[in-house]
């Protein structure tokens, strides 16, 4: 029903925008180029209209303090009084990153949980695919120093570097799951520039343990630590509209939310069972490795009958974003074949 409502909002809006563009082209007749422009325009209008109505729905749900899933005033929360009963892994895949930055973020997450009542239920893994030998050596030295600083808790912190980084990040996580996944109920996946509070990590683990039909909970990672005008502007914009968009997305996605590749918790057993990705036949861009693997993995979990949710509470989950438009373009090229 919610998807139908969303479609009834998006389709007429897109049609109206497309008709307006058509009327601009019409007086002098339509050329082949203008027909192509009209087709591309309709595609972009649909995308924009979907974001617009998602934001509008989220705005009113937040305005009246209504939970986007239950549509009630009180949002369901996991029972925080019950201690965690399963083991969970916090994994950070890295590839040729700035060693100091990743170690600072990694240690911050560890220390967030060290003194908690559930500290024994979490293990931490830095999963390195670094090819630059100088950076790989720096990672190992920094990790050795980290273990010394952590004292007794260091027995729950691990570093692994693959000799061959087959299948990029997908292969990195796959190897972790095959080697150690059976020891854990779930894994919290962080990016190299991610940070998560101890309370948020415990909250995610509770949601997995207390909802046996749920395989994925995606948080909203909020941008932090920006000091350029561009970076601060992006950070401000995200803090302004992310709560509305997240609430709107949760309203119409319900238990079929997307996976963004990081700052999320995944139940390991169904992930291993259903989310093996093939190498597509043919030449790029339609063949080869699936680059936006996270979207596909969420769809595979949902197809197998597992639930996936977007957590609309934006506290406790953070990431860094590129500080200028050039770095943004470089990052976006990762998904271009």
Residue ranges and their predicted role:
Residues 1-82:
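N-terminal membrane-anchoring/stem segments of glycan-assembly enzymes
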Residues 53-56, 60-337:
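Internal catalytic domains of large membrane-associated glycosyltransferases
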